């Protein structure tokens, strides 16, 4: 009997941590979770630098959760 090691594919997580950046150009950002299968997030949230609600766009993936 021969023992072999099987290379199994690593399972991907369902959620990922992404960085959301203000569209006002203030440099303000925050991190949030989203489902891996969804499209990129766009949220309307308060930006404390300009003290207004602005759009936040997903800039980059930080890590898998």
From Swiss-Prot:
GO BP terms: translation
Stated name of the protein: Large ribosomal subunit protein bL33m
Family named by the database record: Belongs to the bacterial ribosomal protein bL33 family.
Pfam families attached to this UniProt entry: Ribosomal_L33 (PF00471)
Species this chain originates from: Tetraodon nigroviridis
Transit peptide interval: 1-8
Source superkingdom: Eukaryota
GO molecular function: structural constituent of ribosome
Listed InterPro entries: Mitoribosomal_protein_bL33, Ribosomal_bL33, Ribosomal_bL33_sf, Ribosomal_zn-bd
């Amino acid at each position: 009997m021969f023992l072999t090691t099987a290379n199994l594919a690593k399972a991907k997580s369902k959620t990922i941590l992404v960085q959301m950046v203000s569209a006002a150009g203030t440099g303000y950002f925050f991190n949030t979770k989203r489902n891996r299968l969804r499209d990129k997030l766009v949220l309307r949230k308060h930006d404390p630098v300009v003290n207004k609600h602005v759009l936040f766009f997903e800039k980059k993936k930080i890590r898998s959760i």
